[in-house]
From Swiss-Prot:
Stretches assigned to the OBG-type G domain: 160-333
UniProt family annotation: Belongs to the TRAFAC class OBG-HflX-like GTPase superfamily. OBG GTPase family.
Protein name per the record: GTPase Obg
Organism field: Shewanella sediminis (strain HAW-EB3)
Annotated segments matching region Disordered: 356-375
Single biological process term from Gene Ontology: ribosome biogenesis
Annotated EC: 3.6.5.-
HAMAP family in UniProt: GTPase_Obg
Biased composition (Acidic residues): 360-375
Function description: An essential GTPase which binds GTP, GDP and possibly (p)ppGpp with moderate affinity, with high nucleotide exchange rates and a fairly low GTP hydrolysis rate. Plays a role in control of the cell cycle, stress response, ribosome biogenesis and in those bacteria that undergo differentiation, in morphogenesis control.
Self-association state and partner proteins as the record states: Monomer.
Annotated GO MF terms: GTP binding; GTPase activity; magnesium ion binding
Matches recorded under SUPFAM superfamilies: Obg GTP-binding protein N-terminal domain, P-loop containing nucleoside triphosphate hydrolases
Length: 386
């Protein structure tokens, strides 16, 4: 299935049902009191994370989604049925953004997590609500309020513990194949990887982490060059980044300049992403002799002024990959647990705008009929006996 990580949709919550103007009609009580019921609340629109989904492709073909409208109230104090909520299932890791305000509404990072994105309209009031000691035959009702309408931008960001960074052909896909069961395409030309790949690494029994491989970055990626820039967002949730450097590039490029270019693109794209823990992984050690290898490693570390962790591996021969995986799982376990944010917060209803300009009179009733109303229906009945 085609991997789609962005989609724009329009969601419309259901309008609230209108109240009813009705009067009780019974035998011997031709002019009974008001019995118009309230309308039903409109259905709301929710997003729900589902681990059985892994792409947003369905939303590219179906962009408009509307919840059910609340039913109108009826006579005999019958309240209208509330509109059914609409639940849209999205992949775990989806972020919802209001396209008009560019406000982030929340992230769905766990299976079954649900987020309210459009609140249904509030119900209208029937004429029973307006009866009083001075108004025995109210003819007024209120309409239901409109449901919320939003244009949403959905962004799928993969959930991974470790993210791979590097130039094209740095060996990222080979590395993920060597440490997990993921099988991304590997070839000797740039941009072999066109979409992100995930793999699960199990260095020890009962301990594992998820690793993400994205298309390679090139200089100018933050300005739109290459493929990797549109996938950098998938690394935002990673807890540590592995910066893979090809120690002997086939095109003769300078690995130091390539590494600097990657760091520069990270800082341009997102300072937050650039501040994440980042380890330097020098790949393809099997292509050089031991003396030349160590000399190049020292030169790269010195020129980059690297202060963090440095590992030397051969992803193709799986040399050093097991040690690196063990270090990663220990580091991830030592990090504090990330706080979970409850996105299913109640939306505060705007009472100031409630029923604004929605009061209306039922045209089926004429105020001139007030004289026919039986006031005794609500008074004490007096029975005279001989």
């Amino acid at each position: 299935m085609k991997f789609v990580d962005e989609a724009v949709i329009r969601v419309e919550a259901g309008d609230g049902g209108s109240g009813c103007v009705s009067f009780r009609r019974e035998k011997y009580v031709p002019d009974g009191g008001p019995d118009g019921g309230d309308g039903g609340d409109g259905g709301s629109v929710y997003l729900q994370a589902d681990e059985s989904f892994n792409t947003l492709i369905d939303f590219q073909f179906e962009r408009f989604h509307r919840a059910e409208r609340g039913k109108n109230g009826r006579g005999r104090d019958c309240t209208g049925h509330g509109g059914e909520d609409l639940v849209l299932k999205v992949p775990v890791g989806t972020r919802a953004i209001d396209e008009e305000t560019e406000e982030s509404l929340g992230d769905l990072t766990a299976h079954g997590q649900r987020m309210l994105v459009a609140k249904g309209g509030f119900h209208g009031l029937g004429n029973t609500r307006f009866k009083s000691s001075t108004n025995r035959a109210p003819r007024q009702k209120t309409l239901g309020t409109p449901g919320e309408v939003r244009s949403l931008k959905l962004e799928l960001m993969l959930l991974a513990d470790v993210g791979l960074l590097g130039m094209p052909n740095a060996g990222k896909s080979t590395f993920i194949r060597s440490v997990s069961r993921a099988k991304p395409k590997v070839a000797d030309y740039p941009f072999t990887t066109l979409v992100p790949n995930l793999g699960v690494v199990n260095p020890r029994h009962g301990q594992s982490f998820v690793i993400a491989d994205i298309p390679g970055l090139i200089e100018g990626a933050a300005d739109g060059a290459g493929l990797g820039v549109r996938f950098l967002k998938h690394l935002e949730r990673c807890r540590v980044l592995l910066h893979l450097v090809d120690i002997d590039p086939i095109d003769g490029s300078d690995p130091i300049e390539s590494a600097r270019a990657i760091v520069g693109e990270l800082e341009k794209h997102s300072p937050k992403l650039a501040s994440k823990p980042r380890w330097l992984v020098i790949n393809k050690k099997d292509l050089l002799l031991e003396e030349e290898l160590q000399e190049r490693i020292d030169h790269i570390v010195k020129e980059l002024e690297w202060k963090g962790e440095v590992f030397t591996i051969s992803a193709y021969n799986r040399e050093g990959t097991e040690e690196l995986s063990l270090k990663l799982v220990d580091f991830i376990d030592s990090l504090p647990e990330e706080e979970e944010v409850d996105v299913e917060a109640e939306v505060e209803f705007k009472w100031d705008n409630y029923h604004k300009d929605s009061d209306s009179l039922n045209e089926d009733f004429d105020d001139s009929d007030d004289d026919d109303f039986d006031d005794d229906d609500y008074d004490v009945e007096v029975i005279y006996q001989r």
